């Protein structure tokens, strides 16, 4: 039985994703590498784990970074992320638990709460803050940095505030729930689905919950880079070659050799599955600026110092 939770459309006049239809049988990808994140602090002392670092940017193009923050100690998150700039990419913040307010120089404001997503396109430049609206309790979530193609890096900044009840959920069977943040799973379109002619990365972003020990299959475009991150319990990735166990708080990079992935989850396991089309463009990064050349980075710094991100 397939149960689908309908979502209110949040992006109008976009084409459906031009994804390749995966034929059966599914050829599951195997695990190329497992990665343990780096503990660090960012913003005003927020404790987090940097799961996807610059080391893996080229391999996991178009994805630039994935941070996982999670603590019930206010000292670990109370300072939040005061005003800071971005140019040339998108940030996707997914809140598992807690309350955080977003404000930016384009005049956008939103409250990110349990299960919600904020999808911000920095484009030509934006200054924003992300500050906790709680003084105690658990705050947990993820922030993904998604690169923009060269022709979109100087686009107008944009912002989507997606509440939890606007994210479609599908149950491939009674033991597995999938929250479809972006892309498509089990014939269910995600909260974000955009024209590939404008946004060629064709991002897939799933949050998969295993209620019992069970399996889940997801079609993947054979041309796309893909990885998963286990944030509860443990899972195994099953392919014709091998079965690989992925423990808690590990990222698994999937080989580009199949048209899907088969995941077996332990009871209560939760995993993010993310994939996208590589841009195959030069990556030049200086902190919160991601462009294609050093000259463009220098211009970004000059523009920020000149106050041009404020408009």
Regions found by a protein language model. Give the residues of each.
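Jelly-roll (double-stranded beta-helix
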Residues: 2-311
């Amino acid at each position: 039985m397939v149960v689908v939770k309908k979502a209110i459309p949040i992006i109008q006049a976009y084409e459906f994703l031009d994804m390749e239809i995966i034929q059966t049988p599914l050829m599951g990808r195997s695990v190329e590498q497992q990665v343990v994140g780096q503990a660090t602090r960012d913003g005003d002392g927020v404790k987090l784990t940097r799961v996807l670092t610059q080391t893996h940017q080229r391999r996991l193009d178009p994805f630039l970074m994935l941070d996982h923050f999670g603590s019930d100690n206010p000292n670990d998150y109370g300072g939040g992320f005061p005003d800071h700039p971005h140019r040339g990419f998108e940030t996707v913040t997914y809140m598992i638990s807690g309350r955080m307010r977003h404000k930016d120089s384009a005049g956008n404001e939103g409250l990110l709460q349990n299960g919600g997503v904020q999808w911000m396109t920095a484009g030509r430049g934006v200054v924003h803050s992300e500050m906790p609206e709680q003084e105690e309790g658990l705050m947990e979530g993820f922030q993904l940095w998604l690169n923009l193609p060269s022709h979109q890096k100087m686009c107008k900044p944009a912002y989507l505030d997606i509440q939890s009840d606007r994210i479609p959920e599908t149950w491939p069977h009674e033991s597995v729930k999938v929250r479809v943040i972006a892309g498509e799973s089990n014939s269910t379109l995600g909260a974000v689905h955009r024209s590939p002619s404008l946004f060629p990365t064709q991002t897939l972003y799933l949050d998969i919950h295993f209620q019992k020990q069970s399996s889940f299959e997801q079609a993947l475009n054979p041309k796309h880079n893909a990885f998963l991150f286990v944030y509860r319990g443990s899972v195994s990735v099953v392919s014709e070659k091998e079965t690989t166990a992925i423990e808690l708080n590990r990222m698994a990079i999937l080989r580009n050799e199949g048209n899907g992935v088969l995941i077996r989850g332990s009871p209560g396991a939760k995993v993010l599955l993310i994939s996208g089309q590589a841009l195959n463009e030069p990556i030049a990064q200086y902190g919160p600026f991601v462009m294609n050349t050093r000259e463009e980075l220098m211009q970004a710094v000059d523009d920020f110092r000149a106050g041009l991100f404020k408009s």
